[in-house]
Amino acid sequence: MPSSGALKDLSFSQHFRMMVICIVLLQVLLQAVSVAVTYMYFTNEMKQLQDNYSKIGLACFSKTDEDFWDSTDGEILNRPCLQVKRQLYQLIEEVTLRTFQDTISTVPEKQLSTPPLPRGGRPQKVAAHITGITRRSNSALIPISKDGKTLGQKIESWESSRKGHSFLNHVLFRNGELVIEQEGLYYIYSQTYFRFQEAEDASKMVSKDKVRTKQLVQYIYKYTSYPDPIVLMKSARNSCWSRDAEYGLYSIYQGGLFELKKNDRIFVSVTNEHLMDLDQEASFFGAFLIN
């Protein structure tokens, strides 16, 4: 049988072992609690930072930054708002460029071909702008509506030389018409200015409350190889002048894109041509090549 001293040593050893195990378990438990608390703390902090960053990003796009485009790299690094905008614009540029490249790759090479450049390597500027010029007689406006194919009276009183605002670049001018030399898509425009002044004799024949009505119409025509002119645009308005008014001023402007061939001719005609004011700033006609 074991002695009493041996039993005491065995009991002490068991108690010591149990104490060590408890201490180890307690340390593991404390570490687990510490890790859990730390994880929850950092998760909460990250969520708050994410929410704040999202709010800052939304605030960046809800207000305008006028100096964004002029900002340097150093200023952008110091301003989170500008960083967000720059990243977004870079993403938009990448997507746009990728889409453009995909689109270009599907277009036949024939459509992508460009006309040869003239000598010097610079593209020609094809454009014309002619302005009104005070007419010496009524012969400057030629009636052209007798055949029923055109309306109004053709304006020939255009200043075609390089005086004032007028110029011609690779477009000819002949008999009040602009003659196209290069085929392509053109923007054509015209403005006509009307000035009405009641004659004293006529005003006596009209009652005080009565007004005189004039129908003002502007036409832009095109001549092609086809014998009859083709109307491209027209604009109209009914204008009333009061008997008590010293004079009335009205203008008509119109413009549009049209495909023109070589040797096509375009011109302007109007109704009530005797009311036109052919000042260069008031009445003008022109066209320029888009592509």
UniProtKB/Swiss-Prot annotation:
PTM comment text: Tyrosine phosphorylated by PKDCC/VLK.
Sequence ranges on the Extracellular membrane side: 39-291
Chain segments annotated as transmembrane: 18-38
Membrane topology: Single-pass type II membrane protein
Residues bearing attached sugar chains per UniProt: N52
Record-stated family: Belongs to the tumor necrosis factor family.
Tissue specificity of this protein: Widespread.
Function comment: Cytokine that binds to TNFRSF10A/TRAILR1, TNFRSF10B/TRAILR2, TNFRSF10C/TRAILR3, TNFRSF10D/TRAILR4 and possibly also to TNFRSF11B/OPG. Induces apoptosis. Its activity may be modulated by binding to the decoy receptors TNFRSF10C/TRAILR3, TNFRSF10D/TRAILR4 and TNFRSF11B/OPG that cannot induce apoptosis.
Organism: Mus musculus
Gene3D superfamilies with a match to the protein in the record: 2.60.120.40
Coiled coil keyword on record: no
Tree of life domain: Eukaryota
Subunit structure comment from the entry: Homotrimer. One TNFSF10 homotrimer interacts with three TNFSF10A mononers. One TNFSF10 homotrimer interacts with three TNFSF10B mononers.
Cytoplasmic side stretches: 1-17
A cellular-component GO term for this protein: extracellular space
Predominant location: membrane
InterPro entries noted in UniProt: TNF_CS, TNF_dom, TNF_ligand_10/11, Tumour_necrosis_fac-like_dom
Cellular localization per UniProt: Cell membrane; Secreted
GO MF annotation: an example: identical protein binding
SUPFAM superfamilies tied to this protein: TNF-like
Amino-acid positions noted as binding Zn(2+) in the UniProt annotation, renumbered to this chain: C240
Pfam families recorded: TNF
Stated name of the protein: Tumor necrosis factor ligand superfamily member 10
GO BP annotations listed: immune response; positive regulation of canonical NF-kappaB signal transduction; positive regulation of extrinsic apoptotic signaling pathway; positive regulation of release of cytochrome c from mitochondria; TRAIL-activated apoptotic signaling pathway
